[in-house]
């Protein structure tokens, strides 16, 4: 028995792994929460060129600015990115730079009102995207169970991606939100690939073979997309590109579980039961 045949024969066991992973990710999201970036909650982001470590910069920023909720991380370019949940004047920024012996590379400020507008837009965009996908999927298949399975896989992809964001500290920003929308688009493609390839082979004795064959194509897509996303993750010169790459990688991990295990199991059981 080959590798792909073993994969199909063990779908029942793999489904347990998929569900456990989803529960862990959902729990992480609820317990830890996904941090919102300044473009969604408002505030100031300062990029400093300094040799001081992020912890030192955080403590200095809190002391000078009188704000406790300060975050500082080292970027892939070696700069320190400081996020402060309030408006900073030019004097505030210069004081911070002098305190840590650094130079100001850039400053980005988002007002609280604009941040709320962005956040409200995000909360509307995701449900609209899922509704649009549900209409398209149902129009293609005209099969409620298959359509529900695809939408279930999409929802699990988002749950898993948000959980991994919570665990790794990747914030929810406009950039990472774009990554989440990319996940929806990619997941629709992979689920339709699986569903179309398998539904066309209706006879029960061919279902496992159809799933295994479609998995070969799907896992090749995952491998090539992951390679591109990892290159962007490692070599990106922009924080936005870094966040997009991270979220896409999380989504690809989730899609392997939710398309090629969860949805494959639903399709096999649906066809086998006819």
Curated annotation (Swiss-Prot):
Keywords: Cell membrane, Membrane, Protein transport, Translocation, Transmembrane, Transmembrane helix, Transport. SUPFAM superfamilies: Multidrug efflux transporter AcrB transmembrane domain. The keyword Cell membrane applies. InterPro entries: SecD/SecF_arch_bac, SecD/SecF_CS, SecD_SecF_C, SecF_arc. It is found in: Cell membrane. GO terms for biological process: intracellular protein transmembrane transport; protein targeting. This is Protein-export membrane protein SecF. It comes from Methanopyrus kandleri (strain AV19 / DSM 6324 / JCM 9639 / NBRC 100938).
């Amino acid at each position: 028995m080959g590798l792909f045949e073993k994969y199909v024969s063990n779908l029942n066991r793999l489904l347990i792994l998929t569900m456990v992973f989803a529960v862990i990710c959902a729990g992480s999201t609820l317990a830890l929460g996904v941090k919102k970036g300044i473009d969604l909650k408002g505030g100031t982001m300062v990029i400093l060129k300094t040799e001081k470590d992020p912890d030192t910069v955080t403590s200095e920023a809190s002391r000078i600015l009188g704000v406790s909720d300060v975050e500082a991380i080292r970027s892939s370019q070696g700069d320190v990115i400081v996020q402060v949940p309030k408006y900073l004047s030019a004097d505030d920024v210069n004081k911070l730079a002098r305190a840590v012996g650094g130079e100001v590379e850039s400053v980005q400020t988002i007002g609280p009102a604009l941040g709320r507008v962005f956040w409200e837009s995000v909360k509307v965009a995701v449900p609209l995207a899922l509704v649009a996908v549900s209409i398209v999927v149902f129009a293609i298949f005209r099969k409620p169970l298959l359509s529900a399975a695809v939408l279930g896989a999409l929802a699990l992809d988002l749950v898993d991606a948000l959980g991994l964001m919570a665990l790794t500290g990747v914030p929810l920003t406009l950039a990472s939100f774009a990554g989440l929308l990319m996940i929806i688009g990619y997941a629709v493609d992979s689920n339709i690939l699986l569903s179309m390839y398998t539904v066309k082979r209706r006879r029960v004795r061919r279902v496992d073979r159809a799933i295994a064959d479609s998995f070969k194509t799907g896992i090749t897509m995952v491998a090539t997309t992951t390679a591109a996303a990892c290159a962007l993750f490692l070599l990106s010169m922009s924080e936005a590109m870094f966040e997009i790459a991270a979220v896409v990688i999380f989504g690809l991990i989730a899609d392997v579980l939710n398309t090629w295990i969860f949805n494959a199991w639903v399709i096999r059981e649906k066809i086998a039961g006819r």
